[in-house]
């Protein structure tokens, strides 16, 4: 999907974007004079795409990869990451979004699959990384479980977040009224999401981990067929 960046407030509220101690406030999101918001992730528009919809069980799982420009006002806030390209106001991101049956084990399975997808990307880019299980105090509004994937940033001598994988059970779908038929019953679907790739943030780890003393950049094996060379510069 090419997801729109402009979203309605009700879709931000429905996905849990506002509210909760670890979530952005309305002041953190760009807003137009027409009361339309610039979204910080394609998750918002993809969930809004199914708002007020009733689906059939055999339509699940819904597996999406959605590309969109993203906008966040918190970039450089409180003196944090004010320089460089790690935290910026506008960036591009591919987001993985899943809707599945209202079953806990189903959510757990797809959550692990989403995380595995992102791990494979980091492995193909040959970027050292770790997977962090977030504690309850770090969860956003409605999140049941969340993994962060953090890539190694040599200039800071520490790992920094590149991906965030969460599942919500029916928190988002109840707010957005996304249901499916299960026999004679209507049930709220379960929702999940995870970053696939966000630029330019991933470039920080990519360049720092592959740069040589002569400033040339080693090309990971997975990308060499596109560059037709092993290094650039």
Please provide the spans of the model-predicted regions.
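TRNA-recognition modules of translation machinery and tRNA-sensing kinases, especially anticodon-binding
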Residues: 1-233
């Amino acid at each position: 999907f090419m997801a729109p960046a402009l979203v309605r407030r009700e879709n931000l509220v429905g996905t849990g974007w506002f509210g909760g101690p670890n979530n952005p406030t309305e002041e953190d999101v760009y807003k137009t004079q027409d009361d339309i918001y610039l979204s910080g992730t394609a998750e918002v528009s993809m969930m809004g795409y199914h708002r007020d919809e009733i689906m059939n069980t055999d339509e699940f799982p819904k597996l999406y990869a959605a590309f969109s420009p993203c906008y966040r006002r918190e970039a450089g806030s409180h003196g944090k990451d004010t320089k460089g390209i790690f935290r910026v106001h506008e960036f591009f991101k591919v987001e993985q979004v899943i809707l599945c049956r209202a079953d806990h084990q189903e959510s757990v399975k797809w959550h692990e699959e989403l995380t595995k997808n992102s791990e494979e990307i980091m492995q193909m880019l040959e970027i050292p990384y770790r997977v962090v299980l977030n504690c309850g105090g770090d969860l956003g509004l409605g999140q049941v479980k969340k993994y962060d994937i953090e890539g190694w940033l040599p200039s800071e001598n520490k790992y920094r977040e590149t991906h965030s994988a969460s599942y919500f059970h029916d928190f988002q779908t109840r707010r957005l009224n996304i249901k499916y038929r299960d026999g004679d019953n209507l049930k709220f679907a379960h929702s999940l999401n995870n970053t696939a790739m966000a630029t330019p943030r991933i470039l920080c780890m990519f360049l720092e981990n592959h740069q040589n003393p002569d400033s040339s950049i080693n090309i990971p094996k997975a990308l060499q067929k596109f560059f037709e060379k092993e290094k650039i510069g």
